[in-house]
Curated annotation (Swiss-Prot):
Keyword vocabulary terms for this entry: Antiport, Calcium, Calcium transport, Ion transport, Membrane, Transmembrane, Transmembrane helix, Transport, Vacuole
One GO-annotated biological process of the protein: calcium ion transmembrane transport
Keyword Membrane: yes
Source organism of this protein record: Oryza sativa subsp. japonica
UniProt protein name: Vacuolar cation/proton exchanger 3
Length: 417
């Protein structure tokens, strides 16, 4: 039998060590908790308080309150639109921060997915409610807004600031994007022509089948384009001046992050959830807003709704043009248009297919013709690789003509209903 006094002595000898170990463990846990809290507070400060657009955030909760307390659909629509605008910008910011940690390939896929997340979320809620024309027109409006208004304002502002010289950009990149946009026009044109020439094999079904097949082809084409861009090719399709940029500046611009990877993921999840909530109220208020504001649904969908997703892109495109970084401006404006036409629209067709909704690529003749003419105008503007304020002014004036056209346009499907 062991001596109890020996056991007690051993316990007394090891007691201070056990106490020190427990104290050290609690200190480590406390320090980790403190670091977590400090990191969380820092990310909140950066994400919430560094963007002036966030002054519009209170309009989001206000729109929800108005939805349940009044029947003023016009105010609910406007407040929802204002509330989503800063969320769209912060969603893009969180995506860019996460892309820093993931590398160019995954970062490119993230940008393809979340770059136009606001438009996709609004489109999915509209699809859920069977508002196929709102989906088609809002996505068309985003393309037109980016190509004409965003790029026009950027060219105009950059041309005024740098009026003594021509601003140049990569012609090769512009040609590739123009080609993809023309392919998107082709994908939208054939279902419309098939419908209006009454040459379908199965009336009302052939255009849907063709749209679904074309959407899959367009998604493959966009995936190939992404791979082509992200495969590390050092050729004419890289942005101009990239080879001349000092390594220090490149590292400084490309690799520095303001928030951590897990913080970026958390913000992406929270912002996407909040955009989803507000999008539901926005979509539900569209028809009521059309009546109360005395505006056509087509005008709201094509002109007003794209403001939600394009406000941040508009500001950043102008800023980069004023800094004489035209390739980044084109990446924002034309790149976003390419992404919507070759990824978001086909993706919505596939999602509608899964939902049992007959979402197709028949955007009607008026909308398809508008897109076709716009792509041609922009392609001619970009063919020489030079930007100036006159080109910007012409693009802005073209957008005003488009806006006026949709203000007096009566949607044939709406009138039939």
């Amino acid at each position: 039998m062991e001596n109890p006094q020996i056991e007690m002595g051993a316990f007394k000898a090891n007691g201070p060590q056990l106490q020190n170990g427990g104290l050290r463990s609690s200190m480590v846990q406390s320090w980790n908790l403190q670091r977590f809290v400090e990191s969380a507070l820092r990310s909140i400060r950066i994400v919430i308080f560094t963007s002036k657009l966030n002054l519009l955030l209170p309009f989001g909760p206000a729109s929800i309150i108005l939805h349940y307390t009044t029947s003023r659909h016009g105010l609910v629509f406007l407040f929802s639109m204002l509330g989503i605008t800063p969320l769209a910008e912060r969603l893009g910011y969180a995506t860019e921060q996460l892309a820093i940690y993931t590398g160019p390939t995954v970062g490119g896929l993230l940008n393809a997915t979340f770059g136009n997340a606001t438009e996709m979320i609004i489109a999915i809620y509209a699809l859920k409610n069977g508002m196929i024309r709102v989906v088609q027109q809002s996505l068309l409006g985003s393309i037109l807004s980016n190509m004409l208004l965003v790029m026009g304002c950027a060219f105009f502002a950059g041309g005024i600031v740098h009026r003594n010289k021509d601003q140049v950009f990569s012609k090769a990149t512009a040609v590739v994007n123009s080609g993809l946009l023309l392919m998107a026009v082709m994908g939208l044109m054939f279902p419309a022509v098939l419908h209006f020439t009454h040459s379908e094999v199965r009336q009302g079904a052939s255009e849907v089948s063709l749209s679904r097949f074309s959407s899959c082809i367009m998604l493959v084409a966009y995936a190939s384009y992404l791979y082509f861009q992200l495969s590390g090719r050092n050729n004419a399709y890289s942005p101009i001046g990239s080879e001349e940029m000092p390594n220090e500046d490149a590292a400084e611009e490309d690799e520095e992050s303001e928030i951590g990877m897990w913080e970026s993921i958390a913000w992406l999840a929270m912002l996407t959830l909040w955009v989803s909530i507000l999008s539901e109220y926005l979509v539900n208020a569209i028809e009521g807003a059309s009546d109360s504001l005395n505006l056509p649904v087509a005008f709201i969908s094509v002109i007003l709704l794209p403001i939600v997703g394009n406000a941040a892109e508009h500001a950043s495109a102008i800023m980069f043009a004023m800094k004489d970084k035209l390739d980044i401006t084109l990446g924002v404006a034309i790149g976003s248009s390419t992404q919507i036409s070759m990824f978001v629209i086909p993706f919505c067709v596939v999602i509608g297919w899964m939902m049992g909704q007959k979402m197709d690529l028949n955007f009607q003749l008026f909308e398809t013709a508008t897109l076709f003419i716009t792509v041609l105008v922009v392609a001619f503007m970009l063919q020489d690789g030079v930007a100036n304020y006159l080109k910007g002014l012409m693009l802005i004036l073209c957008y005003l003509i488009v806006a006026a056209s949709f203000f007096v346009h009566v949607d044939p499907q709406s009138s039939d209903d």
